[in-house]
């Protein structure tokens, strides 16, 4: 299944291939939030040179989330082994929500602690990642590809997540 997240930022567009076959729960969560417009207008609230850029906090502080948490998904062949890896930011095991990060280079110390669920598609996408600074914005995020099968397989999770989202963000 070929799915691409397209993150339009104030610095340019980042195209990310999602690893939905290996991380279906994480990808379904990300896609669901994207389809609801959750990420649109959010900032990159944490940027560390030569390490990563992080966004997806509705408060812009790194302390917020969608109103629910879900478990990690680890795969032996998905590692933080290069620049451009998309992962879930978390506060420990089973605390994934909406915050994501994209690496500037290999970060092997994060393996087994953060779910890898995508990677930038090209050097030009990575150039945009490298140009992002704290406070830069995700203007609009959308998905390219057929999400129907993936989302149908995660319907029970989606129902739970969307109930929590409706409570926390009634305008989504």
Which residue ranges define each predicted feature?
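Cyclophilin-like peptidyl-prolyl cis-trans isomerases
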Residues: 1-172
């Amino acid at each position: 299944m070929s799915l691409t997240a397209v993150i339009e930022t104030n610095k340019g567009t980042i195209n990310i291939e999602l690893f939905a076959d290996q991380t279906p729960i994480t990808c379904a969560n990300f896609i669901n939030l994207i389809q609801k417009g959750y990420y649109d207008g959010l900032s990159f609230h944490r940027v560390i040179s030569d390490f990563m850029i992080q966004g997806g906090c509705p408060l812009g502080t790194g302390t917020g989330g969608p109103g629910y948490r879900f478990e990690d998904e680890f795969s032996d062949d998905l590692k933080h082994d290069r620049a451009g890896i998309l992962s879930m930011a978390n506060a420990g095991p089973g605390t994934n929500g909406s915050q994501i990060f994209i690496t500037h280079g290999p970060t092997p110390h994060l393996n087994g602690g953060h779910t890898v669920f995508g990677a930038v598609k090209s050097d030009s996408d990575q150039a945009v990642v490298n140009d992002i600074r704290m406070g830069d914005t995700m203007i609009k995020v959308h998905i390219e590809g057929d999400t129907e099968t993936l989302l149908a397989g995660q319907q029970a999770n989606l129902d739970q997540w969307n109930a929590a989202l409706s409570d926390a963000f009634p305008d989504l």
